[in-house]
């Protein structure tokens, strides 16, 4: 899980989700997991 100020989709399979006001990106590739901090 990477914590970044700006989160972007890295590949086509990345999906953007908003969970209680945090933007989270989940993907089949575990290296692409991100959340906004």
UniProtKB/Swiss-Prot annotation:
UniProt cross-references to InterPro entries, sorted A to Z: Ribosomal_bL36 (IPR000473), Ribosomal_bL36_sp (IPR035977)
> Which keywords accompany this UniProt record?
Chloroplast, Plastid, Ribonucleoprotein, Ribosomal protein
Main localization, broad class: plastid
Membrane-traversing stretches: none
Domain of life, per UniProt, equals: Eukaryota
Q: Does the keyword Ligase apply?
A: no
Q: What Pfam families does its record include? A: Ribosomal_L36
Cellular localisation: Plastid, Chloroplast
Cite a GO CC annotation.
ribosome
> Which SUPFAM superfamilies does this UniProt record tie to the protein?
Ribosomal protein L36
Biological processes, Gene Ontology terms = translation
Q: Name one GO molecular function term.
A: structural constituent of ribosome
Xref: NCBIfam families: rpmJ_bact
Per the similarity annotation, which family is this? Belongs to the bacterial ribosomal protein bL36 family.
| Protein's recorded name | Large ribosomal subunit protein bL36c
Write the gene name.
Answer: rpl36
């Amino acid at each position: 899980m990477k914590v970044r100020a700006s989160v972007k989709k890295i590949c086509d399979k990345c999906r953007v989700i908003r969970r209680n006001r945090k933007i989270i990106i989940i993907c089949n590739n575990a290296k692409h997991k991100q959340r906004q901090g």
